[in-house]
């Protein structure tokens, strides 16, 4: 009986783990992001926001972009700020921070043309104070 209980608990908890890690990172980001302002240096912004993403696995993150444009070094860092219940990691679950020559010049997808990938939202209804996803 104990083995059955333990196996069931492991199965149930292992499915929740990644979502809880992501949700914690999002909460930490939400707490820290108000301290960031346009014009801040890249090192200042990363010192404030990177700790919020530290517990995420590489599959739960989005790699930064770096390129030169008109003699300006453009770097875009993406921070996890959302999660869809579809299990996919898509662009719309991140907020981009754009740096030109090491200074923060823009925050958000509007500055770089919008996300390339988007998650699948699930419709839901509420019945007797319980959310039903379908």
Q: Which role fits each region the language model picked out?
A:
Residues 17-134:
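Residues within mature, well-folded domains
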Residues 12-15:
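C-terminal motif of bacterial Sec signal peptides marking the signal peptidase cleavage site
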Residues 2-7:
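Sec-dependent signal peptide recognition
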């Amino acid at each position: 009986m104990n083995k059955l209980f333990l196996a069931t608990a492991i199965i149930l908890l292992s499915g929740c783990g990644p979502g809880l890690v992501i949700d914690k990172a999002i909460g930490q980001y939400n707490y820290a992001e108000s301290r960031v302002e346009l014009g801040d240096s890249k090192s200042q912004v990363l010192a404030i926001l990177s700790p919020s993403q530290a517990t995420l696995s590489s599959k739960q993150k989005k790699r930064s972009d770096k390129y030169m444009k008109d003699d300006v070094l453009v770097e875009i860092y993406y921070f996890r700020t959302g999660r869809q219940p579809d299990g996919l990691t898509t662009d719309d679950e991140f907020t981009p921070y754009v740096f030109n020559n090491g200074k923060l010049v823009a925050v958000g997808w509007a500055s770089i043309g919008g996300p390339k990938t988007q998650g699948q939202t699930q419709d839901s209804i509420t019945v007797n104070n319980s959310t039903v996803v379908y």
